[in-house]
């Protein structure tokens, strides 16, 4: 192959644009600290059910719980509007001709992949709007034969599997959380919302808004300009930011509403 291909710089390979495989195990530390802050804030006002502790890295459990009219409700917490809703590596199954989620084998990562599957992420990646009709990536074709990946393979895959953003409506996110009995979400700097349904009936007493943000699924490649190595990954991100909610459980006036309706 032409030597001019060696070391070709692609914008997808930027070291500042981190993908799933770049992320350290403590990437969510700021998010965990924020969850702990809200937990302590509510706990100080006796607004947390007895015995509950934050889930931390356990993606299968709610981030927090709060009391309303004597009943506990689950709460999802995001540090800010830039927080992702899940990331994963992507690989291709040569036998089934399907993309699938892949990554680390920690409990946190496995639960995250399961959540993304339930959200239909694998289906989105395999759709015609994504990479469903693009054929077999040479990266995985080579690996299935135990052959070395070449610069030419990289150029081929970078051309035939362009990075894409696929829009996902808010109902998909709401349905996913509702299936886990989570109907409320707090986003730092934006406020507190209900998703899909408002089982606590908080709209009767507060200015809480229905979450109206939309998501986008990013599918991408990333490699190095010094070697032909590269990989594929995906991330679920906020696309259209939600309208700011006047109800915010971190603010004193909203906390007063919770306290007044605690039991």
What function would you assign to each model-found segment?
Residues 1, 5, 18-21, 47-48, ...:
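Extended hydrophobic/Leu-rich segments
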Residues 1, 14, 19, 60, ...:
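Terminal low-complexity, poorly structured segments
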Residues 2, 8, 217-219, 230:
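Short, intrinsically disordered low-complexity segments
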Residues 3-37, 53-59:
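A short, highly charged nucleic-acid-interacting micro-segment common to nuclease
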Residues 18-28, 36, 76-228, 237-238, ...:
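Catalytic cores of nucleic-acid endonucleases
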Residues 39-70:
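A short acidic/basic microdomain associated with nuclease active sites
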Residues 56-58, 65-76, 82-84, 255:
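Active-site beta-strand-loop-beta-strand hairpin of nuclease catalytic cores
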Residues 240-263:
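Charge-dense, extended regions
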């Amino acid at each position: 192959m032409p030597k001019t291909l060696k070391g070709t710089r692609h914008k997808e390979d930027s070291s500042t644009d981190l993908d799933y495989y770049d992320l350290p195990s403590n990437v969510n530390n700021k998010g965990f600290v924020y969850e702990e802050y809200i937990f302590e804030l509510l706990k100080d006002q006796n607004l947390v059910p007895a015995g509950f502790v934050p889930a931390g890295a356990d993606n299968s459990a709610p981030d927090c719980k709060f009391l309303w009219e004597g009943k506990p409700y689950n709460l999802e917490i995001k540090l800010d509007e830039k927080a992702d809703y899940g990331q994963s590596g992507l690989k291709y199954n040569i036998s089934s001709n399907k993309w699938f989620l892949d990554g680390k084998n920690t409990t946190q990562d496995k639960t995250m992949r399961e959540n993304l599957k339930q959200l239909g992420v694998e289906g989105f990646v395999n759709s015609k709007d994504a990479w469903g009709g693009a054929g077999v990536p040479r990266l995985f074709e080579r690996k299935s034969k135990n052959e070395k990946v070449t610069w030419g393979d990289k150029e081929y895959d970078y051309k035939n599997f362009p990075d894409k953003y696929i829009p996902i409506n808010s109902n998909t996110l709401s349905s996913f959380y509702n299936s886990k009995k989570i109907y409320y979400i707090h986003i730092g700097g934006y406020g507190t919302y209900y998703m899909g349904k408002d089982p606590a009936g908080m709209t009767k007493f507060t200015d809480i808004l229905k979450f109206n943000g939309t998501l986008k699924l990013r599918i991408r490649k990333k490699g190095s300009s010094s070697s032909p190595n590269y990989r594929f990954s995906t991330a679920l991100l906020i696309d259209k930011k939600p309208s700011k909610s006047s109800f915010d459980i971190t603010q004193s006036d909203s906390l007063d509403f919770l306290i007044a309706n605690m039991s």
